Amino acid sequence: MVCEEREPLRTYTEKNSPVYQDSAVEAFFQFEPKGSYSPVYLNFEANANGALLAGYGAARTYRSYFTEAEYREFDCKAEISDDRWAVNLRIPLHILEHIYGSLSLKEGDTFSFNLYKISETAEIEHYASFSPILTSTPTFHVPEFFATAVLTRA
């Protein structure tokens, strides 16, 4: 994800830190194993230091977290330039299948997602989403407002 922002707030450097208090980007994903609905979704939140907060579950509370080995496989990296910053990470299929069971993903398959920009720090507090969220207070943990993505060849 690329964020057009100069001098992002980036306090946290360790995994599982509350990076949403910094200037952060977030990606949420939800897959359906073999066409059956699963309420479980994944969230990946990162700041411009590459500090990653990631979890999965069916609701905002009682999230499950990834192992140290899984965090290494995500290989979250951040880059900062004059007027923007970017975060890259990868999500190995075997980690998705550990959560959802066999997915047998192929070109043309779909999944649900949303992308966010956030900071909960009062001086720079802001919230934005790719797919609109129709709630009275900002919250990103609402799969009913996720968009649909289609898998294509890279």
Specify the residue positions occupied by each region the protein language model found.
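Structural preference for beta-rich elements and adjacent junctions enriched in aromatics
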Residues: 1-154
